[in-house]
Amino acid sequence: MAIISMKQLLEAGVHFGHQTNKWNPKMKPYIFGARNNIYIIDLQQTVGLFQNAYNFVIDTVSEGGEIMFIGTKKQSQDSIHDEATRCGMPYVNQRWLGGMLTNFVTIKKRIDRLNYLDQIFEDDSVRAFPKKEIMGLQKEREKLVKVLGGIQKMKSLPAALFIVDPKRETIAVNEAKKLRIPIIAIVDTNCDPENIDYIIPGNDDAIRAIKLFSSKFADAVTEGKRRYEERLQAETDKDAESSTVQQEENPEADIPESIETKESVSAAADSDLDENE
C-alpha cells in the first residue's frame, strides 16, 4: 500500500506547477503537460519518488540520525514548525543564517548563549542584573529564539535535510552539498533539481501540499525513532541474556577471591591442630 495516494496529492493541489514561462527545463522529465499556461506535474512519479524519500527518512532516523525541516517562506512556516515539533526534529522556518551548517561551531556558541539566557530568566537569577540590562537581555533572547529556536536542542549536524522550495533556500542547499548532507526537497517546476538527492516533484507554494508532505515525513521520523528504540532495547536484552549465560556456565566467577571456601577453612584448621600436637 502506498504511503501517499494520488487522491491525497490531487486534493492538496500538488500537481499544479508554475506558469509555463517560469520554468526550469531540467524539470521537464517530471512534467505531465500544461493546462491554461500552467504546468501539470506528473503525480505518478511523485508517488514513487516520495516513497523512496519516505523510506530513506525512516532508515536514517532508525540509525540515530536527525532530519532538519526547512521552509522559510510564509506558506511553509506553520507546517514546518508544527510537524518538526511533533516528531522532535530541528527546524528552520524564519531565516537561514549563513554558516548554520558549515560554521556550526560558531552557531553552537549562539545556541549555548540562548540556553544560558533561558536559564537565567526561568530561575529568576536575571533579577540580579540592573533593570536596563534585563531589558537588553530580553531583546537578545527574543532575537535568538526567532532564528535559533528551532535548532536549540541540536547537538550536532543533521543527517539529512527536508526542504520546501530549494530555489528559495539556496544557501542551505549549498551548505549541505559542501558537507555532503543528503537533501530531500519538494521541487516545483521552476526549481533546479540537480543538487537534490531525493526529489519530490510538487507544488511548493500551496499550504495544503506543504502540510501533506511535512506531516508524512514527520510520520516517517516517528517510525524511524520507534525502530531505533526497538533496536536499542533488543541490544540491551541481548547483552543481559549473554551475561546471564556466562554466569550460569561459570558460577564460581562471581565469588570474590577474598572469600574462602569451606574446604580451605577446614584445611587450615587441620594444619593448626597438627602444629599444636
UniProtKB/Swiss-Prot annotation:
State the Gene Ontology BP annotations. Answer: translation
InterPro entries for the chain: Ribosomal_uS2, Ribosomal_uS2_bac/mit/plastid, Ribosomal_uS2_CS, Ribosomal_uS2_flav_dom_sf
UniProt KW keywords: Ribonucleoprotein, Ribosomal protein
What CDD domains does the entry give?
RPS2 (cd01425)
Q: Which GO terms describe its cellular component?
A: cytosolic small ribosomal subunit
Cite the record's Basic and acidic residues compositional bias ranges: 228-241
Q: Which Gene3D superfamilies match?
A: Glucose-6-phosphate isomerase like protein, domain 1, Helix hairpin bin
Q: Residue ranges of region Disordered?
A: 228-277
One Gene Ontology molecular-function label: structural constituent of ribosome
Q: Which PANTHER family match?
A: 30S RIBOSOMAL PROTEIN S2 PROKARYOTIC AND ORGANELLAR, SMALL RIBOSOMAL SUBUNIT PROTEIN US2M
Q: Which family does it belong to?
A: Belongs to the universal ribosomal protein uS2 family.
**What is the protein named?**
Small ribosomal subunit protein uS2
